[in-house]
């Protein structure tokens, strides 16, 4: 019994001691604020009034700007501010405490949402910690400041027409998802995004930032929604693409042009230039694949660097085709046909344009034309001359045989001037030869050849026939060595004519080659500097416009 009485006395004494222990003021303040507080209710005594939420962002780092998928990943710090009328306290009652920290999940929070976010789970986007409460005796409300770090991944429609000299404008849209303007009204705390703690990105400049408030009426809802649009103006740093894409492409194209249109190699032919063109096209296609991997899959536009590489591919393709034509021109000389006068005249103009010297025989003919020197009017090719001689030989052999059979009947060997080629080619076809004269002695009847006929003054045909017959008979009696010399001379003439043709077409191929070299180099310079100059002008003007 005594033990029970002692236990009761100890319990009573302990309770009295606990009751007399003072409770900390801030604990008492928290208990007083949260005892009757419901975080599910909008903290306004007048429910018809909206809660004004102030929003600000301090950009910390741009982590990624993805061109193919067209999104931006960035790290930022967000501060939201609003007044909570249910959490007001009088500092005089709590030892002049004006600030308090409470967990975020113990108070009412606005459901601020990034409308164009690509991440739907809020926990993956922001990390909420504690909120700061500051009592305001004038408004009889507590100012709530919610500061939290975020990693936002949001969509941005990129304009890559001037890539890599492009400027991007990306906008983040914030608002409440459940409250319209009568529930929550958003206001920007500043008209710009803070960049005081920003870490510079290796690929992008920030030209300008802007925050704009906008009221939007949606078809689903009767009241307007207040949106905050935070805009980033970004300009790309093009040095990486200049060094790794544009300059290598330009060098490859220039080397290909030089390889296409330089003089032939030690082998004397140009077939290896086609292989050079095919190899260069393969390397350009690899560069094109590198660019396409960084571009979005779209058919609405072609980026500037795409036009550049495509133009270089066209230049190399045309160079390969022209090299094939030049090879065909060079091989044309092996056929032995000389260039026509019209083609030679055109080649002389191109040679003057490209400062190419003329071949010796062409230069000699050119000088003769300049001084009005006479040139041969008729040019008989060796093959044609041989065929003509063979035809004449056959005709006059048969005629001589007929004349021998007739004896001295006085019939003349008549040649048709309309069918005899040598009559047209000889400048003295209508004049009697000195070897045939009226005073020539007659040929005896025992001779196998008929005596020469005496040409009458009225019969030129008989005179010409007698002349040709005499020449033919004389040639029949020439020794064999003299015939061999004639054949060797004809072969030498054909060989010389072929050598002249080879020299002419080789020279013409060189002239065309140098002309195309000048044209392709000019086209290359215009394309290279023109396209990049257009991109640089756009890049520079964007910096001036947005204050970069």
Swiss-Prot record:
Which ranges sit in the Cytoplasmic compartment?
A: 538-548
Q: Which UniProt keywords apply?
A: Cell membrane, Glycoprotein, Ion channel, Ion transport, Ligand-gated ion channel, Membrane, Receptor, Signal, Transmembrane, Transmembrane helix, Transport
> Where is the secretion signal located?
1-19
Please give the PROSITE patterns that the UniProt record associates with this protein: NEUROTR_ION_CHANNEL (PS00236)
Species for this entry: Caenorhabditis elegans
Task: Cite the residue spans of the region called Disordered.
Answer: 422-460
Output the PANTHER family linked to this UniProt entry.
Answer: NEUROTRANSMITTER GATED ION CHANNEL
Q: Its Gene Ontology molecular function terms? A: excitatory extracellular ligand-gated monoatomic ion channel activity; transmembrane signaling receptor activity; transmitter-gated monoatomic ion channel activity involved in regulation of postsynaptic membrane potential
Q: Which family does it belong to?
A: Belongs to the ligand-gated ion channel (TC 1.A.9) family. Acetylcholine receptor (TC 1.A.9.1) subfamily.
Transmembrane region positions?
240-260, 274-294, 301-321, 517-537
Q: Where in the cell is it found?
A: Cell membrane
Function per UniProt: Subunit of the non-synaptic neuronal acetylcholine receptor (AChR), which may play a role in chemotaxis towards choline. After binding choline or acetylcholine, the AChR responds by an extensive change in conformation that affects all subunits and leads to opening of an ion-conducting channel across the plasma membrane.
Q: What name has this protein been given in UniProt?
A: Acetylcholine receptor subunit alpha-type des-2
Record Gene3D superfamilies: Neurotransmitter-gated ion-channel ligand-binding domain, Neurotransmitter-gated ion-channel transmembrane domain
Extracellular side residue ranges read: 21-239
* UniProt topology in membrane: Multi-pass membrane protein
Subunit-structure text: The functional receptor is a heteromer of deg-3 and des-2. Interacts with ric-3; which is required for proper receptor folding.
One Pfam family name is Neur_chan_LBD
Keyword Acetylation appears in the UniProt entry: no
Q: Which GO terms describe its biological process?
A: chemical synaptic transmission; monoatomic ion transmembrane transport; regulation of membrane potential
Regions of biased composition (Pro residues) lie at 439-455
Single GO cellular component annotation?
Answer: transmembrane transporter complex
Record gene name: des-2
Its domain of life? Eukaryota
Glycosylated where? Answer: 52, 96, 224
């Amino acid at each position: 019994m005594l033990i029970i009485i002692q236990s009761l006395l100890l319990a009573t004494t302990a309770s009295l001691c606990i009751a007399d222990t003072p409770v900390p003021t801030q604990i008492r303040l928290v208990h007083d604020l949260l005892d009757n507080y419901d975080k599910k209710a909008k903290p306004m005594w007048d429910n018809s009034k909206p809660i004004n939420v102030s929003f600000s962002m301090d950009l910390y780092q741009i982590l990624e700007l993805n061109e193919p998928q067209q999104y931006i990943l960035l790290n930022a710090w967000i501060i939201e501010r609003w007044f909570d009328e249910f959490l007001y306290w009088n500092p005089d009652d709590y030892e002049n405490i004006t600030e308090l920290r409470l967990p975020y999940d113990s108070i009412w929070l606005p459901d601020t949402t990034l409308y164009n976010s690509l991440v739907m789970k809020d926990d993956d986007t922001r990390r909420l910690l504690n909120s700061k409460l500051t009592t305001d005796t004038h408004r009889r409300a507590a100012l709530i400041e919610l500061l939290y770090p975020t990693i936002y991944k949001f969509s941005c429609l990129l304009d890559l027409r001037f890539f890599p000299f492009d400027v991007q404008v990306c906008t983040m849209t914030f608002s409440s998802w459940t409250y319209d303007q009568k529930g929550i009204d958003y206001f920007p705390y500043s008209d710009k995004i803070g960049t005081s703690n920003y870490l510079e990105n290796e690929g992008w400049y920030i030209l300008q930032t802007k925050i704009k408030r906008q009221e939007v009426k949606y078809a689903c809802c009767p009241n307007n929604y207040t949106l905050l649009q935070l805009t980033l103006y970004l300009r790309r740093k093009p040095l990486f693409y200049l060094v790794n894409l544009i300059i290598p492409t330009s060098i490859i194209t220039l080397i290909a042009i030089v390889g296409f249109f330089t003089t032939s190699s030690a082998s004397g032919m140009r077939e290896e230039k086609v292989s050079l063109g095919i190899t260069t096209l393969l390397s350009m296609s690899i560069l094109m694949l590198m660019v396409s991997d960084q571009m979005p899959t779209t058919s609405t536009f072609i980026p500037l660097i795409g036009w550049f590489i495509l133009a270089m591919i066209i230049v190399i393709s045309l160079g390969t085709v022209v090299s094939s034509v030049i090879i065909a021109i060079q091989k044309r000389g092996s056929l032995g046909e000389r260039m026509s006068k019209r083609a030679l005249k055109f080649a002389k103009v191109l040679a003057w344009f490209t400062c190419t010297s003329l071949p010796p025989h062409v230069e000699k003919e050119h000088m003769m034309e300049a001084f009005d020197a006479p040139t041969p009017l008729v040019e008989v090719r060796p093959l044609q001359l041989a065929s003509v001689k063979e035809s004449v030989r056959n005709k006059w052999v048969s005629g001589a045989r007929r004349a021998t059979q007739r004896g001295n009947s006085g019939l003349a060997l008549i040649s048709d001037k309309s069918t005899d080629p040598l009559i047209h080619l000889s400048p003295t076809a209508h004049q009697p030869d000195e070897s045939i004269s009226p005073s020539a002695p007659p040929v005896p009847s025992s001779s196998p050849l008929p005596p020469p006929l005496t040409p009458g003054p009225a019969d030129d045909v008989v005179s010409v026939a007698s002349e040709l017959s005499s020449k033919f008979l004389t040639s029949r009696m020439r020794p064999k060595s003299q015939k061999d010399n004639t054949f060797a001379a004809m072969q030498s003439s054909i060989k010389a004519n072929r050598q002249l043709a080879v020299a002419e077409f080789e020279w013409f191929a060189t002239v065309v080659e140098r002309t195309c070299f000048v044209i392709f180099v000019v086209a290359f310079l215009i394309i290279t500097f023109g396209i990049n100059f257009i991109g640089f002008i756009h890049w520079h003007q964007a910096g001036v416009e947005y204050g970069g």
